[in-house]
Amino acid sequence: MALKQFNPTTPGQRQLVIVERSGLYKGKPVKMLTEGLSSKGGRNNRGRVTARFQGGGHKRSYRFVDFKRLKRDVLAKVERLEYDPNRTAFIALIRYEDGQLSYILAPQRLGVGDSVVAGSNVDVKPGNAMPLGNMPVGTIIHNVEMKPGKGGQIARSAGAYAQLVGRDHGMAILRLNSGEQRLVSSSCFATVGAVSNPDHGNINDGKAGRSRWRGKRPHVRGVAMNPVDHPHGGGEGRTSGGRHPVSPWGKPTKGKRTRSNKATDKFIMRTRHQRKK
């Protein structure tokens, strides 16, 4: 789907660039595949702010998206493509041959009326899910499991994909969008194709209100605060903060590496920090 620009009839429309969504379904989602979602405003169960700059926004209902594709070797037909306010990608409503309805992440080049299936020996075409061990090397994939049966975790946002670049001793070698190369079990399932809505990265909200509609509040810089509120705060006139960037609690930020999961280091063949070639 293409990008849509507007005539500058108002200041908010002058810079506005959105994704043209005329091909998506305009009705309500399937009720049995949705559930209520309460707005947290960035607060935890004690009422304390644990995630700053969140709150407000339009009311949402959560769509149950099938990341596991456990219904194997049963053909399903794409009924429609839908907008999902809870993620950047579009979702597809599929109807299995036995009549069951389900939502899946919509890959690029998947249209209404197309057939999809999950299984061990299925065709390599967008929307079909299969184990990494049964895919040809070089396949573009998304919604990749990290543990067999756990459900897809890698490459789920708009336009994202990973590539199967090799196999080694029962493991599949994946190249991710970030440049990282990592090992995943060959029995893990993945879906063929790249995630829909690749133009999401090119949108321009045009005005602050569009961010507020999504539940995002203004992101205040530390140097604009008082010393009581932030380590970068205070000073006469505008200052640069006077030290390396830190969080409001004094921890280094902006590029400081925080990964500490040594147990899974052995699965990362090439980190995303190494220069991409």
UniProtKB/Swiss-Prot annotation:
**Organism domain of life:** Bacteria
Matching entries from SMART domains are given as:
Ribosomal_L2, Ribosomal_L2_C
Looking up InterPro entries in the UniProt record yields: NA-bd_OB-fold, Rib_uL2_dom2, Ribosomal_uL2, Ribosomal_uL2_bac/org-type, Ribosomal_uL2_C, Ribosomal_uL2_CS, Ribosomal_uL2_dom3, Ribosomal_uL2_RNA-bd_dom
Q: NCBIfam families from the entry?
A: rplB_bact
Query: Gene3D superfamilies, from UniProt?
Result: 2.30.30.30, Nucleic acid-binding proteins, Ribosomal protein L2, domain 3
What PROSITE patterns has UniProt attached to this entry?
RIBOSOMAL_L2 (PS00467)
This protein's record includes keyword rRNA-binding? yes
Single GO molecular function? rRNA binding
Region (Disordered), start-end ranges: 222-277
Q: What is this protein called?
A: Large ribosomal subunit protein uL2
Keyword presence, Ribosomal protein: yes
GO BP term, pick one:
cytoplasmic translation
Query: Whose protein is this, by species?
Result: Bartonella tribocorum (strain CIP 105476 / IBS 506)
The uppermost taxa in this organism's lineage are: Bacteria, Pseudomonadati, Pseudomonadota, Alphaproteobacteria, Hyphomicrobiales
PANTHER family listed in its UniProt record: LARGE RIBOSOMAL SUBUNIT PROTEIN UL2M (PTHR13691:SF5), RIBOSOMAL PROTEIN L2 (PTHR13691)
Quick one: which gene encodes this? rplB
Please provide, in alphabetical order, the Gene Ontology terms of the cellular component aspect for this entry: large ribosomal subunit
Family, per entry: Belongs to the universal ribosomal protein uL2 family.
Self-association state and partner proteins as the record states = Part of the 50S ribosomal subunit. Forms a bridge to the 30S subunit in the 70S ribosome.
Q: What's in the keyword line of the UniProt record?
A: Ribonucleoprotein, Ribosomal protein, RNA-binding, rRNA-binding
